[in-house]
Amino acid sequence: SSYDACMFVGYHAKKGTLEGVMSHTYSGGNIESLHVNGMEVGETGLNARIAAHHGVPLAFLAGDVATTKEAKEVNPGIVTVAVKDAIGRMSAKCLHPEVAREEIRKGAANAARLKLKPMAIKAPVELLIRFTDARRADAAAFIPTTERVDGKTIRLVAPDMIVAYHGFIAAVLCGTAVS
C-alpha cells in the first residue's frame, strides 16, 4: 500500500454500547451485532480490518469517549481524541468546535509520527451477523455460502477480509430490503 496509516474522524460506538452517542453497527435498525473471527466489532473494528487487509494500520480516531475505548481494543497504540461524552444515547457534552478541531489536529499530527503495524487478520475470515429480527436473517440467508446459525444470525466464511466485507454489505442490503 502507498499509505502509512488511516485515521477515523467522527466515529461512534458499536450498537448497544453503554454511553455510546448514537451507537449503532452499520445499520441500526437492521444489524444487532457483528463478529469477525469471534470478536464483536463495530464500524471501527470492521474498517480497521479492511485497512489492515491492505497493509495499513489504524493510527488515529476521534469520536465519543466510548468509541475511543473501543478503538484502543482494536489497536492499543492508537492516538484517540474524545470530542464528546455521552449523557445518554442521543445526547452528549461536546467540546467547543474550535477546541475539538485543535485537539483533532494535534492528535492526528501525533498519530502521523507513529510507526504502527496493521493488525493481523486470520484467514479464512468468519462473520457472524446478527440481525434485529428473523425476517432480515431470512432474506440474508439466501446469499450463497451463508449458513443460518439461529433465528436472527447468519454465518459467512470468506477467504479474506475484502470478500467478507462484500458479503457483509450484501447481507445488510438484504436485511434492509425487508420492511
Residue spans for each PLM region:
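A broad structural signal for short, well-ordered beta-strand segments within beta-sheet-rich domains
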Residues: 30-33, 58, 121-126
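Active-site rim beta-loop-alpha module in soluble metabolic enzymes
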Residues: 53-58, 62-111
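Short beta-strand segments
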Residues: 6-11, 61-62, 130
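C-terminal accessory domains and tails appended to enzymatic cores
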Residues: 100-179
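Short coil/turn connectors at secondary-structure junctions
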Residues: 1-5, 13, 54-57, 76-77, ...
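Short acidic, glycine/serine/threonine-rich loops at helix termini
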Residues: 17-21, 71-74, 141-142
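Active-site glycine-rich loop that binds ribose-phosphate moieties when present
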Residues: 29-54, 61-67
